[in-house]
Amino acid sequence: DIFEDKFLKVIKKEDISKIKYFEIEDHFFEKRFNNFVLVNKLNHETINNPMFLTSRLEFKEFLQSQKKLIRMASFYQKIRQKLSILIDDQNKPLGGKWSYDEDNRKKLPKNIDIPKIPPIQNDNKFKSLKLKINSFFYDHPGSTDYLWMPTDREESLMWLDNFFENKFSNFGNYEDAIRSENNFLFHSAISPILNMGLIT
């Protein structure tokens, strides 16, 4: 419990009367941290995580409001209305439809040019971390031999810009397309860096 011990020392040394922290999205660490707070009887406040457009409470209330089958489409509609995303002044979807899924299933033309994902420039920053991963997590699945995604905010934002500049215009048409020799096609592949909070 090295982290907890050090954190508690800082709290006592700085005479901190209350700690405030964002919701912890790693469930294992959240449980561990909550236990640390409870055992040490720390005055604390949990703040909604800015990585998400909705709070946990809001999503929980949505789930409780669903009497039968839970449909994520209903949740997306609710959030679009709340945040006025592609919504007209009558609180209806722009274009008259909530979903255009049928337009996402076009067949990928044989001669279409597929933009490559941007090469990663920050591999040097990853080298020391790679050594630690290989040392402490050597028996875990996966490999550190090839780093294909950004690990810092600067490159993550460049990655996002690249998606809008080179892929976004074709993303909708070929969202569900598959090609065996290409893993990403017109997808942004930003889910991992979104989940790490590098774009938030």
Regions found by a protein language model. Give the residues of each.
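Proteins with a high burden of low-complexity, intrinsically disordered sequence enriched in S/T/G/P/A and R
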Residues: D1-I2, T200
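Beta-rich, aromatic/charged-enriched effector core domains that present basic-aromatic interfaces
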Residues: F3-W148
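Catalytic cores of enzymes that engage adenine nucleotides and/or redox cofactors via long glycine-rich
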Residues: N104-T200
